[in-house]
């Protein structure tokens, strides 16, 4: 039998250390044991404590807390206004959705799927219809790309303690009293006397990157403890999988949503925490921005969703990102993402090469937030974020808020001039407007939908992708 020598082992170790990570690949982070070098012309940039990535350019971007230079002026580019149409066909009875489709056999559509038509071809007429369509979209996304989101488990208990302006929410969740997990997120409170209904709260994935205004509490959610995201080898690792098993279909992002829901359960059970559970927001940046969008889509108790620079796999659409790739923009797409990490279910691997057969896309994921509020922020300086895809995808999603008659509950702002996940001060007024209105219950103007139109080698043309006419849902 062959026995490797110490010299051979040393050579293997040396070769592993010298290997370069691929373009856009992971090159560092907590728990990372793979290559740390990048190809020529690419630099290993730390995006957060858990993840560094090979990005184009010779020098890494400054840390998130570094003050960013003012971005170039953004030009307003409003989405197409809704045009009223009279849908044909019967609608589900309000409150009774009937059978919910989780798959659509023989689907084939290279353009963006119509949010206003059920899988069976029936057109939406009413706001109650949207509730049913939203349930259908949820089932489709879980089946095709996210994995199954389990319901509230039989055991959920919580206790709360506070020292100064910092609180600790100790949560136990389990399938039985003998099969539980525990986690304890911390809450940073504003100074002063809380409002009568408690403080509004933002759940911040890994602490978040946005400036939180006065009067809003912040809960730091260590989502990577709930489901690890170090690399493609992280699948089935984390607290969620200790409870449901390492082979559960839920992706890491779906497991994070489950954790957010348990946090809100715990807050509802602990009035001493003095949190207004009717005024909860969620945020995160980059990979955690993808997760924040997923949480806002699936957890209906979230009042305001704020994904930041989530890009492909977040507020970008798979079909549009592929279009960018096909036309010379080096962006992340579905094929690259499923090989990079565990943010999506293994079932999605079956569809990344045949996206037209998928009866959903991320304009529908974002639309699941409606009629609740959402604003997403993107950065055109990083082409791999797929800026045209994000703008086009959110333009398509915006039609749902338009159809519901609440267009100013959905916003989008896209600028450059700052590092990835560094906050540009020029966007603070838009951010504060949404927080003031939807978390602080103050009057604010939230008609925000802007881009600087820096899309690399492509341009957005709504007529090429949006095939539906936006109805006025009654």
From Swiss-Prot:
Compositional bias of kind Pro residues: 68-84
Region (Disordered): 61-91
Amino-acid positions noted as binding substrate in the UniProt annotation, renumbered to this chain: 290, 332, 340, 384
Enzyme Commission designation: 3.1.1.117
PTM text: N-glycosylated.
Motif (GXSYXG catalytic site motif): 284-289
Protein name, as recorded: 4-O-methyl-glucuronoyl methylesterase
Organism (species): Cerrena unicolor
